[in-house]
């Protein structure tokens, strides 16, 4: 008989309720379990009488454990209130956990998350009404905006489709019950942007009709768009399902107009079209997962941490399971996760030092070699035995470092990055808990990677057939090692997160400081060899190696110098590996985290440049990308580009840009009222004074002004929403919607430079000067760094404007 597959669990008043799958059937099981937390006994004794007077009916028992009092509850729902009682009097320990989390933490039975059946879904809704959003950005559908259809495809490719039969409550209730019934047959459900749209929409409609959906508490919901962003970890102009499907699958969504009742009209008049459109969306998500397998990665990570799949969405949650379990094994009781006031207090300490990213040598380069730290932060943690219980203190005076370079201690190197980050001291006589966890994750990953090499290639290096070649096993092993890698890299985040029980500013800063100092040490050694270090990105370096050296020689050298480096700081467990990773055929380096490169396969990649940003208008992005591609392909033609600038100028000033090229997109981070106040001078930290002697007020961006006008006109606009707009006048800026622009004429309220309220008469023109500068800014950035200065083309701006554009080349951002 197969072991049960644990789907999800939930706290009950006197235990835990578990949903599990066994032999193809779902079951629930109620288990008795008393939740508990700890108080230092020295704090418990003087407050015991008051506490027991209020909570004696809910406390099962108390017991003393190594200076702590363990309080067990016979009513798990009183744990939160009991915590508040103690928080007013003293520090609590592990008092934040609900019973189901504590139960998983205390147990060791296998969960088998990798065997959970999963389902992809997509809903279509009545789009005749404007959508509203709550403070968290979740959709709030209008009470009359029904769900029209729901398409679902499971992990085996089975398709399901339910539709609204009639536009009435009875039909929608049936549809909702069908959706809920199918959801209940799976352990994981996922859709694209479902955290903000599909799931809150469905729950809102269920609430409206008073339909019980407790079953969803026992189903893991994963937003696949969030998974894609998390695990793919690349910047893109758009994360729409259509954009990602085109990129990953070279497939598109089925054409279908949306908004202003278009979906509703299709439901009324062409139900087959709506069905095709709806099902295709779910099938696209399935196909993306077949390639990327992010559901499977999430399941494997849940196994690593012994938690539910939904707990892997946030690294801090799965990381808590990983770390707290080992602290428990070591007999160490940890603090509770902080409450709001403590989080705010922690954040006052300021930002923890970040990674070392630099651009030392901007320009165009060929044959660029990249060296990269293997698991940089995990390796630093293990090398310097960084953990809460091993931390001794901080050394602010470097003259005092020597006294700690002994057999008992290891010292982390200091570093200067905008400000001084001091050395820290850790005991090395006993391995820390965090290094134990990190070592386990890294070592397990290394074992799998070794096996992967055996199964990866069909042919051996000598051309003979590889009898161990197994692409299916290779993919399985790849997912397993990727899960371990993600978990290993997430540990630092738990220490640096102000909301975490593991947060410690000194410890987190010692990790990033050690990493920066070590990377800079490697830079210096490369430069001492005569290599040209162009710059780097957190854990890597872009280098032109000196003629006469080989990659292997430099790899061997790094083994030697990193051992010397860690010996100097008295580490007895060096795990630092700085090794050759890859080579760029060509590279255009503009500034840190802003570059383009062509790999040895001829593929071009863009990092950080405006061509990849959603806020860049499409024409500017297209032009910058074309320029970079010409440069990287070594087909750059300066005459072509000099003429191109003239052509673009004529295109823009002849009013020939189309609405798509004109449309700008920016997120609405705050409303107009939040822009009140004055511009602060960075040098004086006082309000900036204009030439006429008046104080310079903060200007309100065009998309914010547009949002304010639309709200006044009765439109539903929420903070966090993406605003699509076209600028028809600048200084002061006036923006309208693409739909308003397409009408060709219009009258809009406007406040001119003299603060007069006037009516602006729109006659179909956009502001040519505004768009010209927006197009030039990204182009000037790449042209400037390729040429080592700005080419003397006719840029069609004044000398002052050109000077400003060149000055802002390092800050170009739409």
In which residue ranges do the predicted regions lie?
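Metal-dependent phosphoesterase core characteristic of DEDDh/y 3'-5' exonuclease domains
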Residues: 145-156, 189-190, 194-275, 280-283, ...
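Catalytic nucleotidyl-transfer cores of nucleotide-processing enzymes
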Residues: 199, 211-214, 224, 230-231, ...
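Active-site palm subdomain of RNA-directed nucleic acid polymerases
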Residues: 253, 518-538, 543
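Common nucleic-acid-contacting/processivity interface regions adjacent to the catalytic cores
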Residues: 265-385, 466-517, 521, 535, ...
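A glycine-rich phosphate-binding loop feature that marks nucleotide/adenosyl-phosphate handling sites
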Residues: 300-312, 396-400, 462-464, 505, ...
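Catalytic palm subdomain of template-directed nucleic-acid polymerases
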Residues: 541-560
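C-terminal, non-catalytic extensions of nucleic-acid polymerases
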Residues: 555, 559-814
